[in-house]
Amino acid sequence: MLRLPRITRRALSSGALAPHFDRPLPPPPPAPPAPLCALPPLTAPDALAPLTRRTVRHADALVARIAAAPAHPDPAELRRVVKNLDRLSDVLCGVIDMCELVRNVHPDPRWVAAAEKTYETLCSFMNQLNTSTGLYDALVATVSHTFPGNPLSPAELRVAQTFLSDFERSGIQLPPGVRAKFVRHSDNILSLGRTFLSFAAAGPSADTPIEIPEPEVLLAGLSSKFVASLPRKKRKGPALLAPGSWEAQMIGRYADNEEARRLVYIGSMREDKDRVYVLETMLKERAELAHVLGKETWADVALSDKMAKTPQNVLQFLTSLATHHRPSAAADVAALQRLKALSTVSRTSSQLPTVHAWDRDHYAEQYAASLLPNGSLPSITPYFSVGTAMSGLSHMLSRLYGISFKPVSVAHGEVWHPSVRRLDVMDEHGKRIGVIYCDLFSRPGKPSAGAAHYTVRCSRRVDDDPSEGDGLPPGWDQHLGKGMEVQGEALHGKEGKYQLPIVVLTTDFGTVEESGPALLGWNDLETLFHEMGHAIHSMIGQTEFHNVSGTRCATDFVELPSILMEHFISSPAVLSTFATHYTTNEPLPIPLIQAHLQLDQSLKALETHSQILMALLDQKYHSIKHGEQLDSTRVWNELQSQVGVIPPVRGTAWQTQFGHLYGYGATYYSYLFDRAIAGKIWSSLFARGRTGPAAANHDPAAAEDILSREGGEAFKEKVLKWGGGRDPWEMVGDVIGGAEGEQVAKGDEKAMELVGRWMIK
């Protein structure tokens, strides 16, 4: 068993890390601008156009080389096909992924416009490559060849199978005219998806304000100052609210009058026919694309290479969860009904009143207050400055995986806003293994799409690139500028040199001022640990191949490391190792931690049931067939009536705000699926039966066991380091071990049922 010294607060001194996040940083010294993210081509917005041309030129050369490999007189050229396909993927994704970041976070519209253009051009180009028979035939020839004395490695075979699946999902075996349909439908889906996401990120349309008549009456219970601050059409007229605004949210949560809450809810969720049209057209385009590929539904297409494999398996998983959780969710609703009954003075019926969608937040707030001795709890935010949380994260990761964060000053021009911080991720040997840019703080005009993890560059081995055979003449890129290529760096325990991963985390955590740091609430803390789980997967999952590096794995596996991180932050023993008051340095009182954790669990069944409903909705939308009509609002309302515990609301269309319908099309169940697996791994590797007093207080032994290197190394070696380079079912089975591990490693229907039982437990 690997053991580290006993955890002490002194050992967890924050050093330079906390000030890096808790104090305003001085501007970098005047100097010629550095390229964005220290990537040489990214010197200015107008550098993206020549970079795009350079990328296409290089990609064309690689395509020609790969397609010619089967006829090449040297068998070694065929042996290089998997490597060259991975290089081709890296050449394109290195620019596409960077543009995805820039178009979402950069405040300069010139950068955004240039990134949008490059993104569209290269995504369309990639869609065409996915139907290239030359590439596909070369890959088939490669995997069919035995290569005596030098067979394809398991990693190469995994990468090859990933590419083959991508080609076949793109209809590579279809006639040329049908393949052209694939490209057209894919481009349409890309365009519609971007529009849908922009609508979802923008929130409800503000074209028609919400009107609250007689606000002095309907808004009783809210402060007179708040009511007086609301704009009106005319003096003594109705108050006007922007749908989805913070004022609307305040009324939905705190207004005692049900009619006021109803008006705000319907106004914020009202059906927008243009947005509904975009969503339904996108879903129909996906159904058409599935038909082109010879599949019944888009869910069949999307799940073919996922752990769940089929829509039937997903529906079985979700239906069993819904059946199990519905009574508990109904019990949560009954608790809210009782509170509503107490506040409904004119009630004459003995039946409990219905809790509507506009009641949920209001009575949930009252329910939470009813659990507290004096109706409230002291805030925990002073104990969690961003710097304190980052220091705790770094020390936790050091104990588990032997990696830590090193704060680094950025050069002028390296980041898109002065509030962005850079961390170098270091191994135990003092070697940098990657870079994380942290765009964590609020700023005017910052997109409010929530927290996100962007992979700007994946890791891969680069010293063995056979670039001399690409067929590009000397000086071919002289007029196009620099590319994304790197020389690579040596990593401890790995042969060769690797390009290091670069990731970006974005959140909206308030601002850092001279007067004090940004402080995190409980949800913020969970968000930070969750997103850092993705980043650490990228840092540790450094494989030889770009296409299976880090988070490039099955969608229903990728959330596992992040959800596991949430378990650590929910452990009082772990929190007690770093949570200190930002002014007094006093430790967070354990009873206060426990009270907040208990509060966080209130109405949890209702929240879980809501997630199940959303996952079922995602499946239903992506189970429509070619030519089938779709009324997305009717489908959502019927699902709420049949499976939900709160009735639907006429005239609303919440589904247009469900942005994950694009990015997670038919795979939104992944959050629940990975939550089941993460819970099992947590109890098997880290909690190890610690459910008694030692786990619930600051007993150092509890923290030492939870943060044991033994558990961390097991998860690192059996899961994280592989990225997507190994069958995820085998990884889960390996880390669980025993009879259950053997069963789940098979990845069949019984394995799916077993994961479902883990969730129900």
From Swiss-Prot:
Query: Per its UniProt entry, which superkingdom is the organism in?
Result: Eukaryota
CC terms in the record's Gene Ontology section: mitochondrial matrix; mitochondrion
Offer one Pfam family short name for this entry. Peptidase_M3
Which compartments is it annotated to reside in?
Mitochondrion matrix
Classify the main location.
mitochondrion
Q: Which reaction does it catalyse?
A: Release of an N-terminal octapeptide as second stage of processing of some proteins imported into the mitochondrion
InterPro entries (UniProt xref): M3A_MIP, MetalloPept_cat_dom_sf, Neurolysin/TOP_dom2, Pept_M3A_M3B, Pept_M3A_M3B_dom
Going by the record, the broad EC class of this enzyme is: hydrolase
Cofactor(s) required for function per UniProt: Zn(2+)
Instruction: Write the record's keywords in alphabetical order, separated by commas.
Output: Hydrolase, Metal-binding, Metalloprotease, Mitochondrion, Protease, Transit peptide, Zinc
What would you give as a GO molecular function for this chain, any one? metalloendopeptidase activity
What's the record's note on cofactor binding? Binds 1 zinc ion.
Does Protease appear among the keywords? yes
One GO BP annotation is: protein processing involved in protein targeting to mitochondrion
- Enzyme Commission number: 3.4.24.59
Residues annotated as binding Zn(2+) are 530, 534, 537
Instruction: List the catalytic residues.
Output: 531
Report the family membership: Belongs to the peptidase M3 family.
Name of this protein = Mitochondrial intermediate peptidase 1
Q: Which organism is it from?
A: Cryptococcus neoformans var. neoformans serotype D (strain JEC21 / ATCC MYA-565) (Filobasidiella neoformans)
